[in-house]
Amino acid sequence: MNIVQNSIFLSNLLRSSPVFELKYDHSCELYRMSTYSTFPAGVPVSERSLARAGFYYTGAKDRVRCFCCGLMLDNWKAGDSPTGKHRNLYPSCSFIQNLSAVSTVGAASQPPAPLSEARSTHAQSPGLERSSYFSASYSSFPVDPVDFRPSPAMSPWRAGPSCVTMKSEEDRLCTFQGWPLAFPLPSALARAGFYYVGPGDRVACFACGGKLSNWEPDDDALSEHLRHFPDCPFVEGQLQATVRYTASNLSMQTLAARSRTFCNWPPRAPVHPEQLASAGFYYMGHSDDVKCFCCDGGLRCWESGDDPWVEHAKWFPRCEYLIRIKGQEFISQIQASYPHLLEQLLSTSDNTEDENTESPIVHFGPGEYHSEDAVMMNTPVVMAALEMGFSRSLVRQTVQSKILSTGENYRTVNEIVSDLLHVEDEIREEEKERAAENRESDDVSLIRKNKMVLFQHLTYVLPILDSLLMAGVLNEQEHSSIKQKARTSLQARELIDTVLVKGSSAVTIFKNSLQEIDPMLYKRFFVQQDRKYIPTEDISDLPVEEQLRRLQEERTCKVCMDKEVSIVFIPCGHLVVCRDCAPSLRKCPICRGTVRGTVRTFLS
């Protein structure tokens, strides 16, 4: 028998309200709430917050389960946030994603998503307040399938008349002299249009008269106002004044949410959390790493005197949040103060560094390395991986990569072991490539390593093609296929790739043909070994059409030969590939140096 159907009170309530048509399954928040009738009394987490986070009671100890993703949690401790734990442990859950979306200003302006996260409740009429059902442990109906918006037909939830005397935010703020809670801040409530009416934590909107109470720490005043009273004229005015922008992390869109992430901010860090949160940054939980909620740009290694807004504009000038708050003029001034930022970045890299030298991915400040390294490497999960026999240096580098990319350490042994095995496979593949290169003849290895430079400057392709055809290196089909390419650079690329595939004998014939047909290029490439700075031909005397064609070739990606180059490799500084081809390259195709990082450029 269904629990809700067994309840006389709930049945009478549903029959008396024609608006309500309740589903009898765990997707309904009211139904989930009804499963907590036998929930242990000593658990330090409220049944209401568990039901709101998508959990229903399993009947065993304090174990609960998500109706959507199946996540089971127990052993609740004081201070635990059911919504936060749900989001952290199973972020792909569609229910918890909807909760996150509703909590933002942008999302709240849309029709309410099912089972929203808001923890405040409409003020109840005296008749309903006397009922134990509408206690602090549960405070809202589900949005779907129940119509939860205030309407004249639902008198217990009807918004009161507007209060013209509270139109001023300052006047509203003065009413919070006896505010009983530390959250939300009175300034945030007043800014959201509310003034304090009591009793308890009840507030009312000056414009629509809507009343809310039973506030919890995670509540955002404006988001709650939007969710419960979307037709409020004050809310509509706020939405019209809001410039929409795309946020990379919706859960960090509010200042309060970002500020809460700084609870473990290093006390000796020279920049205050308030400054960082105001500039759009939230704390990643490691060292002094922060990220912008909007553009996802990350910054670290803060120094005394750093201004978060200036650093934001310096490194991420296209951030929509930055542009909206500070304006384009401020960003342009900061950018003008650092005209050679890209050159400085490239100059700090050592071009002569051995590609096999192990370099740490995360750079710690003075005196921080040993303590943070110890914390990072001595978690139970990491220690378990070390006990399996993985190299400590390999584990350290893998953990650092994880922290750098996600802001947190590994949570499970399976996850870290999977990544370690993947890294070992990559290392073995690189060793095989090096061994294969060593087995090849010197000429084959030379051309393979520098083929990008060679085919960029190989202009006499057709005579060499004919020579290789006569020598039997190419057949008629290969000769015709290469010859039909529209541009010389494409012909050169396919010719060299074909020769390399055929092996050392084909390379020898190609080398002899090049010596005969283009002795200048042969001398510079094979004799002088001047492969880094082969001068380009003076094209000033060529026809304008030919000059344009060659300039276009120089700006074309040397991998796909289609899109425009836009990625600079670090540390070598070569600009030869587009943004789509760059992620697949571990080594620069020009100098064969290991790619440590990339910078996107915009050619004017």
Curated annotation (Swiss-Prot):
InterPro entries: BIR_rpt, BIRC2-3-like_UBA, BIRC2/BIRC3_UBA, CARD, DEATH-like_dom_sf, IAP, Znf_RING. Zn(2+) binds at C292, C295, H312, C319. It catalyses: S-ubiquitinyl-[E2 ubiquitin-conjugating enzyme]-L-cysteine + [acceptor protein]-L-lysine = [E2 ubiquitin-conjugating enzyme]-L-cysteine + N(6)-ubiquitinyl-[acceptor protein]-L-lysine. Keywords: Apoptosis, Cytoplasm, Metal-binding, Methylation, Nucleus, Phosphoprotein, Repeat, Transferase, Ubl conjugation, Ubl conjugation pathway, Zinc, Zinc-finger. Coiled coil: none annotated. A zinc finger (RING-type) spans 557-592. GO terms for cellular component: cytoplasm; cytosol; nucleoplasm; nucleus. Its main location: cytoplasm. USP19 regulates the stability of BIRC3/c-IAP2 by preventing its ubiquitination. Auto-ubiquitinated and degraded by the proteasome in apoptotic cells. Pfam families: BIR, CARD, UBA_BIRC2-3, zf-C3HC4_3. Residues 439-529 form the CARD domain. Its EC number is 2.3.2.27. BIR repeats lie at residues 29-96, 169-235, 255-322. It comes from the Eukaryota. The modification Omega-N-methylarginine is found at R130. It is found in: Cytoplasm; Nucleus. The modification Phosphoserine is found at S140. GO terms for biological process: apoptotic process; negative regulation of apoptotic process; negative regulation of necroptotic process; positive regulation of protein ubiquitination; regulation of cell cycle. Belongs to the IAP family. Multi-functional protein which regulates not only caspases and apoptosis, but also modulates inflammatory signaling and immunity, mitogenic kinase signaling and cell proliferation, as well as cell invasion and metastasis. Acts as an E3 ubiquitin-protein ligase regulating NF-kappa-B signaling and regulates both canonical and non-canonical NF-kappa-B signaling by acting in opposite directions: acts as a positive regulator of the canonical pathway and suppresses constitutive activation of non-canonical NF-kappa-B signaling. This is Baculoviral IAP repeat-containing protein 3. It comes from Canis lupus familiaris. The gene is BIRC3.
